[in-house]
Amino acid sequence: MGTKAKAHIILLPRWFAAPLFGAPIVLGALLAGGMSFTSWIGLLAGLLVMAGGHSLNSALDYAWTGLDRGGGTERSAEKSYTTAQNLIAKGILSVKSVYVNGLCWYLLASIPLVYLALRVGYAVLIVGFAGMSITFLYAKAKFNWTHELVLGLAVGPLAVLSGMYATSGSPPWKSGLLASVPFAIITSFAGLALDEWPDAKANLAKGVKSIAYKVWENGVSLEWYLSSWLLFSYMYQIFLINIGILHPSSAVSFALWPFFIGSMVFLRTHFKKASGAFVAAGIAYVIFIVLGHALG
């Protein structure tokens, strides 16, 4: 596979994040009655929306917000888990081709979404198109203090609701909203501070405003910040189990606590490897919640 083909098909969509978006979709389907044929179609649609959103975000962060533009230390840094943010700056892809890439993923996602709308109900179409719009809100959210909220909305409520409405025309959506919180916490409220840590100096010079960047700017301990959100997520998970939304078996995710702690211990000395390990633990966390609930 050529460099450009790999960039378009593998790197821009950021498939490593598929579990972070896919797990809440599956949980939504389970809460709405269980996985069915339309649930799997909904999962496919959700992942295609994710791919398009990631691709368009790369173009927007270069051409619109300018965060990925400039020299090596003046733009977003490459991470151990993704290098897609620098494909345009390095001249591997053009801005136009990245826009086209993102729109093609969205066009592909529209096919299963329309099918689900005709088969299950039109609510899934509304949720799906709302998910597509998130990437444009997210690009500017980094400049108006809604950074975590916008991404949290995408990987939390919208993802869970998409799984629900792909499964049933009248799902228990209130339970879905409550169940979506841990997914929003791990990927957005905790994850963004980690993801933006190496970008903070360059992006703050361009005017970004979000809590994730302030963690770095104000010298707040990243380890303390991450562990605080993790502790809240685990406590909230206990709440969901107690009120009967999650099955007690979903507590298998607690087994990952030592891995989170271990990765944070090495953040100061081996940031790139440790951050990759934290992301891997976060991916396992959302998978364990869903698997535990499904098998319980």
Predicted feature descriptions by range:
Residues 1-60, 70, 130-159, 169:
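Topogenic membrane-insertion module of multi-pass membrane proteins
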Residues 19-28, 150-165, 213-217, 275-293:
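Small-residue-rich segments of transmembrane alpha-helices in multi-pass membrane proteins
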Residues 26-44, 110-125, 159-181, 235-249, ...:
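Helix-coil boundary and interhelical linker segments in multi-pass alpha-helical membrane proteins
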Residues 34, 151-204, 221:
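Functional transmembrane core segments of multi-pass inner-membrane proteins
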Residues 47-61, 132-140, 182-199, 256-267:
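Transmembrane alpha-helical segments that form the membrane-embedded catalytic/substrate-channel core
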Residues 54-106, 186-233:
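Solvent-exposed interhelical
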Residues 86-170:
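Intramembrane alpha-helical segments
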Residues 239-296:
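Extended hydrophobic alpha-helices typical of membrane-associated regions
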